[in-house]
Amino acid sequence: MKPLLLTLVSIFISSSVHAQIAGTVLGEKSHPLGYANVALYSLPDSVFLTGTITNELGKYVFAKAANASSTYLKVSAIGYVTAIVHPIMNEQTIKLKPNEYSLSEVVVSGQRELFKSRGTDIVADIQHSNLRDFGFADDIIDKLPMVSGEHGSYNIFGKGSAVVYIGNRKVSDPSELSRISTKDIATIEVISNPGVKYDADTHAVIKINLKKQHTKGLGGTVALSDGQGRRNYDNEQVQLTYNTDKVNTFVGFSNSTSRYSTDQENTEYVLTPSSAWGLYSNMPKWYSNYYNKTVTGGVSLNLDKNNTLGGQLTYQRENDRYNGESNNVMMQGENVYERVNSTLDSHSHYNQWQANMYYEGHIGTKWTINFNGDYLRRKSTDDKSNEESGTLTNPHTVLTTNKATYNIAAGLVEAEYQLNKNATLKVGTNVSYVKDTKVYSGLDDTAESTASSLTSKETKMAVFAEGEANMGKLSANIGTRYEIFKMSYYDDLNNLQLVDKSYSRFYPYVSMSLPVSDVRFGLSLTTKVQRPSYYQLRNSQEYFNRYEMEAGNPLLLPQYTTDLTYSTQYKSLRFSLSYQWIKDYIMTSNMIDAENPLHILSKPTNKSHYSALNGNVAYNKTIGIWEFYTNLNVMRTFFSIYNTDGTLTNGKRPYAEMSFNSYFNLKNDWMPYLLLKCNSDGYMREYRIKQGFFISCGITKHFLKNTLYARLSVNNILGTKERETRFDTDYKFEKERFRDNRNISLFLRYTFNNKKKYKGKNAASEEIGRM
């Protein structure tokens, strides 16, 4: 009994001298303020004793601290007035007040800016916006200025397809974006003119920067979603992580099933020297089924404070199937030429293995070295069956099979040297090798069978250098990238060399940023290339119906773009304007094989050039519980398409689209939201986009101390259809489609201590993207 009493007394004495101090730091709207600095000082001499930072929930703790009566706290965070706290109480809540100040790249006045300019790029401050509690990265990317798309495939208005990066690592699995919680995101960058460290084929980048994580031990995430439109779709994900100071491991599995029912109506108009033809196609309730399974795992090792290496292995299997009937009427002038009915069934699948390894090291205080290596192998098969009959067409069945095998190997080395506090030099090299084999066979029970086999080999070697300097308020980046690209295509059936070419070119880059008082100006100039996809370069033809065939073009040339972009921002109002000149523009052309009866062959070709002017205005504001973001995009395309008789077939009217998103912060973590989007009737390149209006709404809520997140959403309430027209010489294609995107969905996510720290990035980013 006596030893027990002595122990209790010693514990009591110890606790009175070294008591625990804990509390919570709150920011605007009483939201928890993560990563605030909390320092403990002694009284009365103000000697620094110890310090820490708050976690994601705004909580801090000093396990062993001096007596609270003889100390005080100093709490600080960017954008807030520093608070001095005395006396100190345990489990104390400290609320910081927003500051008002101006810096060259940040302006804070009462409330934070969601969108900030950095040169001509946009940096979205997700962690201090309502988007931080919206679900996953895939749920918020399309809500950023100039961005559209879904499910890992995004476009930057006027720039084209965007490559998504998480830190310095390119995302090759789109489903990964549906596994990154928005609460783990610090910022998202919309890079409209990427620098030379990115592939010359990368026209735009969306870069997700995650928060710094400090947690250890076992963590995990379980996410479930289910939606109902005409048909049901669901998604299930599990990810586990285990972290120590030296090792971070992770493993994940996802299963995605998408089922859609799509309505589409097409009308094609073709002018020939003797007749005007029209083909009307009605394709109601085409069923589509997509099944994707992904397993991934990896490890990162912190060898010491200056050296880190890791590896990741991913396996994917996807099965896609769609089928339906097409009722077609062929008109010659005002008369019905033929009625044709066809039933199409398509089944495709692929298996893919991808491995990545990386090394990151620091040499002294000035050098940083990065190495990344990739290997990918994919085997795919696409089978189609088309049963066709008509008033002039005997019943027949066309069976086609496309088989492809991709092998990609790539390496990337980057080095960064800090010349001084105002200047940095980056150099690097990137090499890749791609081998692609495509085998096609077609069987028509009323005609001869067809077959083709193509083997392509591509080699790319690139070196790049970029310098960054700060001269007073002016910041400038200047660099260039030099690429040598060799392509060789061989017809295996006919033992014929189709293509054996080499391309070499410099791709310069210049970017400048200058703040003047509350206004920030940016200017950038870059040159990019868009190489044809492997599918566009195929030498096979696919049967569509009696009157139409599709083909590839192994002789297709790369497309080059020169882009000059200007931007300016005043507080929360941002404006940008860009001019583009595109050489050897790639577009689908429709060629008349036979005039009577009509037969059309569609294939990608190069047009000499076109130019475009793109504008964007973005603004965000918070009024009480209401926070809204609005975005306006306008495009004027200088691209004329003429018929053989000299008449202009497309128009010149600019195209515009606008979004207005509202979020309402209610008590107890309830957040209803309303998303509005509309577009005008206008022309983009060879397309005319018809007017549309979309409305979606929903509500989000956190439960169980923020570990459980739920979102109920209703999408495309009006059931708006997509309507567009594509123009070519003596040809016009009108499409109206309803994609079964009017639905209601429920999303649930449970997270505990889940922090993935993999730093590798893809060396084969361009090659994977072209697949």
Predicted features by range, described:
Residues 143, 169-195:
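Short acidic/polar hinge/loop motifs at secondary-structure boundaries
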Residues 39-41, 74-80, 91-130, 149-151, ...:
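Short, acidic, small-residue-rich periplasmic hinge/interaction motif at the N-terminus
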Residues 294-319, 343-491, 515-520, 573-577, ...:
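Face-selective signature of the C-terminal outer-membrane beta-barrel domain
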Residues 44-59:
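Short, acidic Ser/Thr/Gly-rich low-complexity loop/linker segments typical of extracellular
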Residues 408-412, 551-553, 557, 563, ...:
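Outer membrane beta-barrel strand-and-loop segments of large Gram-negative receptors
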Residues 454-458, 498-501, 529-583, 600-614, ...:
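Outer-membrane beta-barrel signature, preferentially recognizing the C-terminal barrel domain
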Residues 231-259, 263, 275-323, 351-353, ...:
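Transmembrane beta-barrel wall of Gram-negative outer-membrane proteins
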Residues 90-95, 137-140, 174-175, 190, ...:
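N-terminal periplasmic accessory domains that precede
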